[in-house]
């Protein structure tokens, strides 16, 4: 599985005019399931997303995870948005191939599992809508962006 995480001051996702999810300071994670991914891969990726130290401590060093973004135990928001295009094969030609992405039904199942597990482990979780045409707005903080990828 893949997650492109961005440290944000705030972010929201809309389907049409309806806001489906929004957060204040925290992480926006664009999430993609690849062919052959499993729940174990999702769990491994979630642990990495929640534990990745991208927030600055008192010394200004990136040393704090989203669960403790201020060093005093305050959790930041986690906005999860499905994005199958992260699995694109761009090695040949000028048109991406999405063969590496999980089929839609499997991608939705794994994304839903990822969201469910995130809600069990983190207090502030918002989401987009799987398969919808979404508009994502964010204010990058840094910017700080990381590509995380796991295999089961």
Curated annotation (Swiss-Prot):
SUPFAM superfamilies: DTD-like (SSF69500). Keywords: Cytoplasm, Hydrolase, RNA-binding, tRNA-binding. InterPro entries: Daa-tRNA_deacyls_DTD (IPR003732), DTD-like_sf (IPR023509). Pfam families: Tyr_Deacylase. One of its GO terms (biological process) is D-amino acid catabolic process. GO terms for molecular function: D-tyrosyl-tRNA(Tyr) deacylase activity; Gly-tRNA(Ala) deacylase activity; Ser(Gly)-tRNA(Ala) hydrolase activity; tRNA binding. A motif (Gly-cisPro motif, important for rejection of L-amino acids) lies at residues 142-143. It comes from the Bacteria. It catalyses: glycyl-tRNA(Ala) + H2O = tRNA(Ala) + glycine + H(+); a D-aminoacyl-tRNA + H2O = a tRNA + a D-alpha-amino acid + H(+). Homodimer. An aminoacyl-tRNA editing enzyme that deacylates mischarged D-aminoacyl-tRNAs. Also deacylates mischarged glycyl-tRNA(Ala), protecting cells against glycine mischarging by AlaRS. Acts via tRNA-based rather than protein-based catalysis; rejects L-amino acids rather than detecting D-amino acids in the active site. By recycling D-aminoacyl-tRNA to D-amino acids and free tRNA molecules, this enzyme counteracts the toxicity associated with the formation of D-aminoacyl-tRNA entities in vivo and helps enforce protein L-homochirality. Belongs to the DTD family. PANTHER family: D-AMINOACYL-TRNA DEACYLASE 1, D-TYROSYL-TRNA TYR DEACYLASE. This is D-aminoacyl-tRNA deacylase. It comes from Burkholderia mallei (strain ATCC 23344).
């Amino acid at each position: 599985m893949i997650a492109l995480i961005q440290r944000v001051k705030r972010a929201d996702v809309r389907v049409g005019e309806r806001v489906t999810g929004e957060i204040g300071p925290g992480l926006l994670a664009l999430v993609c399931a690849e062919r052959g991914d499993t729940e174990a891969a999702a769990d491994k990726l979630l642990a990495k997303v929640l534990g990745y130290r991208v927030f600055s401590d008192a010394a200004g060093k990136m040393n704090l995870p989203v669960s403790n973004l201020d060093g005093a135990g305050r959790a930041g928001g986690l906005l999860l948005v499905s994005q199958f295009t992260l699995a694109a094969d761009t090695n040949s030609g000028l048109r991406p191939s999405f063969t590496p992405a999980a089929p839609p039904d499997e991608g939705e199942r794994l994304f839903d599992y990822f969201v469910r597990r995130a809600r069990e482990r983190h207090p502030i979780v918002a989401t987009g809508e799987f398969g919808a045409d979404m508009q994502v707005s964010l204010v990058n903080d840094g910017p700080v962006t990381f590509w995380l990828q796991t295999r089961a």
